[in-house]
């Protein structure tokens, strides 16, 4: 099928290439001329901007958006809403908030434009291994998009999750679980460092990927990371969060659904960014006040 592709970052470029290798016709655009040139060398038709991309597509058009969530996605979808016609389809494959996706679907529907929110997992290795795709939207839109989804995903690697917003909702929870898994692995391997045993962390992680009940792709990546840099030399103890973990925690509060493990994993990331924790210094001082406990001085 013919598909317009907006956004050629780390994942977007890989997805465009996978579509090309699967025999699809891709018209691509990005703010980076270098990124557009790179996929054009592999067979994509370059477009200078969104207007040029839409003009190059045959109706009914399908445009896949793969840009950062928030303002970038809002801007691109708004422009596409003005350029596209009834029967065209917009796919948001980024990590948008599911509430935004529901709103965008409703706004585009008023113009007769279809919308699919496609939660995408697979990272930079998805080009070769395929991408897991969680897709919300009308059945007609999903059916039309199915050839591209089948190419992008590994066997049985995509699912119509329900109406608009459901794809990004499922991806949000997916990422919340990812936070918790990563934190559990990190805590376990930190315990190894204090065990008194001279353990090879990379070999243990690799071992656990073979038949263990805690095996996962994340653990495979951890084994590779520890093999390359066993002590994580030069890696700062600063852990960013990209938004979905926060949204998962907020949703759990709004729904009154306990999610203590995911919440703790998110809070651990916040703590990692504090060079000097006020709360820890508060506790240190308070113990001295009520019990005369020794205060460990800074520096």
Task: Give, region by region, the residue ranges found by the protein language model.
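Rossmann-fold dinucleotide-binding core
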Residues: 76, 97-186, 192-195
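Alpha-helical transmembrane segments and their immediate juxtamembrane flanks
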Residues: 293-299
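Hydrophobic beta-strand scaffold residues
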Residues: 26, 46, 114-116, 259
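Anion (oxyanion) recognition and catalysis
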Residues: 20, 40, 102, 109, ...
């Amino acid at each position: 099928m013919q598909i317009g592709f907006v956004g050629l970052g780390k994942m977007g470029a890989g997805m465009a290439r996978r579509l090309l290798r699967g025999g699809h016709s891709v018209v691509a655009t990005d703010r980076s001329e270098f990124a557009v040139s790179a996929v054009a060398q592999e067979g994509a038709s370059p477009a200078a901007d969104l207007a040029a991309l839409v003009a190059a597509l045959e109706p009914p058009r399908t445009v896949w958006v793969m840009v950062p969530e928030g303002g970038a996605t809002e801007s691109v979808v708004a422009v596409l809403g003005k350029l596209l016609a009834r029967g065209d389809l917009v796919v948001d494959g980024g990590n948008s908030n599911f509430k935004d996706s529901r709103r965008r679907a409703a706004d585009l529907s008023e113009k007769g434009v279809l919308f699919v929110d496609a939660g995408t997992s697979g990272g930079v290795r998805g080009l070769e291994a395929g991408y897991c795709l969680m897709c919300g939207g009308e059945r007609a839109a999903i059916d039309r998009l199915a050839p591209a989804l089948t190419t992008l995903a590994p066997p049985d690697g995509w699912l119509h999750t329900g109406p608009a917003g459901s794809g990004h909702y499922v991806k949000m929870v997916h990422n919340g679980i990812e936070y918790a898994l990563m934190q559990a692995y990190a805590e376990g391997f930190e315990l190894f460092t204090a065990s008194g045993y001279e353990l090879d962390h990379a070999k243990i992680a690799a071992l656990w990927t073979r038949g263990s009940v805690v095996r996962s792709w994340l653990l495979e990546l951890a084994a590779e990371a520890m093999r390359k840099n066993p002590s994580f030399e030069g890696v700062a103890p600063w852990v960013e969060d990209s938004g979905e973990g926060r949204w998962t925690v907020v949703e759990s509060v709004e729904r009154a659904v306990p999610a203590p493990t995911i919440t703790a994993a998110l809070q651990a990331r916040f703590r990692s960014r504090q060079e000097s924790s006020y709360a820890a210094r508060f506790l240190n001082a308070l113990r001295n006040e009520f019990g005369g406990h020794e205060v460990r001085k800074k520096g």
